[in-house]
């Protein structure tokens, strides 16, 4: 969703800034790849296309264009923490909801729709999707951004890779959860508006 869209817009804006032609192109192979990889990671992850860039660029400019997508995801992740924390606090969405860890909650309880659980999960998915998309795109092979960034500057490549790998690893090992992080902000906000 939004993580993918803004990631691609990041590429396009930096490409245009560097005087290149850039537009989104659909890629049926991206869908096939996403379906194939879903068997290994347990959820559907697809790239229906990508921003194609044409023009004379230096290795440095190509690296900047490539890293723009993952850095956009990093920005969306960082902005999402206080933004979703405040939204969830103002709506009282965490009130009475049990912590669900990395994966969602029940949306129906006693025959009633639990909108709070849905809202919490939108925030959780916002954080998780941006981290995972950023990390995935920093892999250094094929058409992914990581190969272009590594070709430009190995120090920058490993720095950005670690910026994504550390929080993803600690998230999946239970050191922190997106839900828990959002609740740290939401609870004081919720207490202020009661």
Indicate where each model-derived feature is located.
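Hydrophobic transmembrane alpha-helices and their immediate loop junctions
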Residues: 1-194
């Amino acid at each position: 969703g939004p993580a993918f869209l803004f990631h691609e817009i990041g590429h396009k804006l930096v490409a245009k800034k560097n005087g290149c032609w850039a537009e989104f192109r659909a890629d049926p192979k991206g869908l096939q790849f996403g379906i194939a990889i879903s068997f290994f990671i347990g959820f559907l992850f697809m790239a229906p296309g990508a921003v194609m860039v044409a023009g004379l660029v230096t290795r440095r400019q190509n690296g900047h264009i490539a890293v723009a997508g993952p850095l956009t995801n990093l920005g969306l992740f960082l902005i999402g923490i206080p933004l979703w924390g405040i939204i969830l606090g103002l709506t009282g969405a965490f009130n009475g909801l049990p912590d669900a860890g990395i994966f969602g909650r029940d949306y129906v309880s006693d025959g009633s729709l639990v909108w709070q659980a849905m809202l919490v999960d939108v925030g959780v998915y916002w954080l998780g999707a941006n981290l995972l998309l950023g990390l995935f795109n920093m892999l250094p092979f094929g058409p992914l951004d990581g190969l272009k960034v590594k070709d430009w500057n190995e120090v920058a490549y490993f720095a950005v890779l670690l910026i994504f790998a550390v929080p993803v690893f600690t998230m999946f090992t239970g050191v922190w959860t997106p839900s828990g992080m959002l609740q740290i902000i939401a609870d004081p906000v919720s207490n202020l508006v009661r």
